[in-house]
Swiss-Prot record:
This is L-ectoine synthase. InterPro entries: Ectoine_synth (IPR010462), RmlC-like_jellyroll (IPR014710), RmlC_Cupin_sf (IPR011051). Coiled coil: none annotated. HAMAP family: Ectoine_synth. Belongs to the ectoine synthase family. Catalyzes the circularization of gamma-N-acetyl-alpha,gamma-diaminobutyric acid (ADABA) to ectoine (1,4,5,6-tetrahydro-2-methyl-4-pyrimidine carboxylic acid), which is an excellent osmoprotectant. NCBIfam families: PRK13290.1. GO terms for molecular function: ectoine synthase activity. SUPFAM superfamilies: RmlC-like cupins. Keywords: Lyase.
Length: 130
């Protein structure tokens, strides 16, 4: 059994920030459970293009509002507390935060914890498990 608090993660290498976002990596690949679980905050007024080419991501929005645009087909979705989206086709997408957005995110395969988005908006492929 693993029990962690966000207070324990704050200020550690599991506490990762980028331009306009902050992520607390609660469950990671080294936990050996087959997925990773993150609490991610997107700053109000920011726009991000992501393209998880090597991961499936499920996102549940717990606070804030914004817009999700599927850049593959142009579909636009309004997001608010209780909204969920699943990127099960590695869709390139744009996230626009009207207010600060807090999201709970699950990645498969799990991330290692230090990943940041590359120029295409992707995380690198997960390392092979030995």
């Amino acid at each position: 059994m693993i029990v962690r608090t966000t207070q324990q993660i704050t200020g550690t290498e599991r506490d990762v920030s980028g331009d306009g976002w902050h992520s607390k990596r609660i469950v990671l690949a080294d936990d050996g459970v087959g997925f990773s679980f993150h609490e991610t905050t997107i700053d109000a007024g920011t726009v991000h293009v992501f393209h998880y080419q090597h991961h499936i991501e499920a996102v549940w929005l717990t606070a804030g509002t914004g817009t999700l645009t599927n850049l593959e087909n142009g579909d636009v979705f309004t997001l608010g507390p209780g909204s969920m989206y699943l990127l099960d086709g590695n869709e390139r997408h744009q996230l626009s935060a009207d207010s600060e957005m807090r999201m709970m995110c699950v990645f498969n395969p799990p991330v290692t914890g230090r990943e940041v988005h590359d120029e295409s908006g992707a995380y690198p492929a997960a390392p092979a498990l030995s």
